[in-house]
Structures are given as structure tokens and as C-alpha cells.
């Protein structure tokens, strides 16, 4: 039984719920990548899946927009996997347990993966319908963003034609960020040594403190 079935936009929520049912933590993206490929096949869309599990899906512009400049929609397939102490979910094999309270979607005792599962859900919902006018679309879904943008770094961009990209991975709803400096991951190693220090050590404690009365 659907947990998100009463929420809008309905098709976006449908795909988000399906995505949440597939294990897709960083480094464990084969199943979610294959899910996107199956979607493309089912909807007779051209696709590319590389050895890293990145997926690109193409859709022609609808009538009247066939010759418009293509637009790229980009998101990532992996999520951050964290859970509360005592939660027995295995992120390698299990989907998430979704719940809705006061219209807010969360996952029971785990991270939700809205970053960036909602981008994938929006992309698939757009790909399945011709209800909205759009130019040719290039849907680029990369992997392992959360651990260093590894999929994006490895992606062969030569098949892509779009000069305009919308990255669906912002922090604030209703806000657009125009241009970006990108991201950098660095591993820094410094020599570390300890020396026994001379001198005396003191422990200080404060007790029986009284807060001032505010009139």
C-alpha cells in the first residue's frame, strides 16, 4: 500500500516512493541505476548507462519545440545513509520505511534521501508525460555525489549537447542559484607527534550557581 499516494504532485511522489524502496547509498547504486534504465526502456527513451552506474536519458522536444536548444536536468542517484541507534535496517539490502506526519515526509529512524532522490523523481515524472511543453531533454543522473562527486568526475560528457543545465540539488525550496563555483574534495595528511608537557594541571568546578532574577 502506498504511503505517499495522497500527496502532490502525485507522479513525483509515486516515483520518490519507488526510489526510497531501492537501496541506493553511496557506493551501492547498481540497483537504482538499473531501475532508471528499466524506466527508459519501458517508455521507449534513448539512454546510456556507463560502467560507473551513471545514467543519461534523452527525450525529444514535444511538438513545436523539436528544434529548440536542449536542456539538461541533473541530479544524483546516491543518498547519505544514517540511522538511529537500534534501527535494524540494512542500507545495503533494505529500502526505507516512509511516514507522513502533517504533510511532512520522513523515514522512520533513518535518513530520507530527499537529497537527491526528489530530483530523480521529478525527472522521471517529467519524462513519462507530454503534458508540459519542453525542448529536447537530457536527464543526467550521476552516482556517488555524496562522497566526492565521483560519478560526475568519471562521466563521459561527449554525448551531451545541452548548453543549459538545471541542477536539481539546491538547499532552499523556491530559490534558484545562478552559476556556482563547483565543489572540491581534498584529503590532507599532516605529521602529528605528541610531547609530554611540564607544569601543573588544575581542575575547576562551579557549584550552587544562582541565576539573577529579572523583574
What does each model-found stretch correspond to?
Residues 207-213:
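Conserved small/polar residues in nucleotide/adenosyl-binding loops
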Residues 79, 170-172, 213:
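Short, glycine/acidic-enriched loop or turn micro-motifs at the edges of active sites
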Residues 3-103:
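Acidic/His- and Gly-rich active-site-bordering loop/insert found
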Residues 22, 26, 106-115, 175-178, ...:
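Flexible, glycine/proline-enriched loop segments at strand-loop-helix junctions
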Residues 17, 21-25, 41, 45, ...:
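Generic secondary-structure signature for well-ordered alpha-helical cores
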Residues 65-147, 152-163:
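Active-site metal-coordination/substrate-binding segment of hydrolases
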Residues 136-206:
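Fold-level recognition of mixed alpha/beta catalytic cores in primary-metabolism enzymes, strongest
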Amino acid at each position: 500500500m502506498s504511503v505517499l499516494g495522497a500527496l502532490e504532485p502525485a507522479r513525483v511522489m509515486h516515483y520518490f516512493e519507488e526510489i526510497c524502496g531501492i537501496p541506493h547509498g553511496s557506493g551501492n547504486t547498481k540497483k537504482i541505476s538499473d531501475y532508471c534504465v528499466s524506466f527508459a526502456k519501458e517508455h521507449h527513451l534513448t539512454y546510456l548507462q556507463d560502467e560507473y552506474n551513471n545514467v543519461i536519458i534523452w527525450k525529444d522536444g514535444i511538438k513545436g519545440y523539436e528544434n529548440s536548444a536542449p536542456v539538461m536536468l541533473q541530479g544524483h542517484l546516491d543518498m547519505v545513509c544514517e540511522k538511529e541507534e537500534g534501527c535494524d535496517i540494512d542500507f545495503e539490502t533494505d529500502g526505507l520505511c516512509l511516514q507522513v506526519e502533517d504533510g511532512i515526509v520522513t523515514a522512520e529512524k533513518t535518513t530520507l534521501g530527499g537529497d537527491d532522490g526528489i530530483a530523480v523523481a521529478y525527472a522521471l515524472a517529467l519524462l513519462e508525460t507530454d503534458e508540459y511543453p519542453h525542448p529536447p531533454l537530457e536527464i543526467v543522473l550521476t552516482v556517488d555525489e555524496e562522497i566526492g562527486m565521483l560519478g560526475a568526475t568519471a562521466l563521459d560528457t561527449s554525448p551531451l549537447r545541452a548548453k543549459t543545465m538545471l541542477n536539481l540539488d539546491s538547499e532552499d525550496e523556491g530559490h534558484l542559484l545562478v552559476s556556482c563555483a563547483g565543489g572540491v574534495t581534498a584529503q590532507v595528511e599532516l605529521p602529528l607527534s605528541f610531547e609530554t608537557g611540564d607544569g601543573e594541571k588544575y581542575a575547576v568546578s562551579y557549584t550552587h550557581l544562582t541565576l539573577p532574577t529579572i523583574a
